[in-house]
Amino acid sequence: MTDNLQDLISTKLAAAIANPLFPAVDSQLRAGRHISLDQLDNHAFLMDFQGELDSFYRRYNVELIRAPEGFFYLRPKATTLIARSVLTELEMLVGKVLCYLYLSPERLAQQGIFSTQEVYDELLNLADENKLLKAVNQRSSGSDLDKQKLAEKVRAALNRLRRLGMIHGVGEQNSGKFTIAEAVFRFGAEVRAGDDPREAQLRLIRDGEAATPDSLALEKQADLNEVDDNDELEDELDDEEHA
């Protein structure tokens, strides 16, 4: 039995799975959380076993990615066996604003601490307020009630991003204060190659680009078509070999 297991799993992968850190790290990754350098033990664990764990997760049609900024996350393919959730357009936009704030001089001036109100104010400053209100309520008239609902949605978006490891709470639980993690660069990958990262991120915010269920469906269909094409190619090669 042991010999058969060794044929299926490498010694180093077995050591990774047996590590007491694995259950918590695995659960966090599967839940969509990003593991940054500030999680010293978990991050060091992933650094030590990155190759082995990437092979492990590929069996579920996901990849273990280490971003240029150093954080880890699971990137699912369309055929993933691990449940994936889609961020709303507002959540994506809030993420882009967080990336913009991360790049701002204010981050150093404020010791990296921001508030929910600052994110809300920056969102209104950078994006089209009417479009934001319409995203919350198609019949929005710009009333105080509509703005209150938008503020509630922004708070909910920040809570969702906190669970994904994008921000970390500071102080009391309901203080609304937080620091921004490097993982927000998931929303700003396009800015890495730009001459001015903040200007590039500002363009992304104004464009309001986001993944939607329709775009994900198209992605999945493209992947399935690629699989079908590969199967057909293999069949043709088999026919040629037997000819």
Swiss-Prot record:
Cited InterPro entries: MukE_C, MukE_N, Scp_MukE
Lineage top rank: taxon: Bacteria
Subcellular location as annotated: Cytoplasm, Nucleoid
Any matching Pfam family: MukE
Keywords tagged on the record: Cell cycle, Cell division, Chromosome partition, Cytoplasm, DNA condensation
Cell division as UniProt keyword: yes
BP terms from Gene Ontology: cell division; chromosome condensation; chromosome segregation; DNA replication
Disulphides: none
Bias kind Acidic residues: ranges: 225-243
Positions of region (Disordered): 214-243
GO cellular component, one term: nucleoid
Subunit structure, interactors included: Interacts, and probably forms a ternary complex, with MukF and MukB. The complex formation is stimulated by calcium or magnesium.
Recorded family membership: Belongs to the MukE family.
NCBIfam families: PRK05256.1 (NF003602)
Functional note: Involved in chromosome condensation, segregation and cell cycle progression. May participate in facilitating chromosome segregation by condensation DNA from both sides of a centrally located replisome during cell division. Probably acts via its interaction with MukB and MukF.
Name of the protein: Chromosome partition protein MukE
Provenance organism: Pasteurella multocida (strain Pm70)
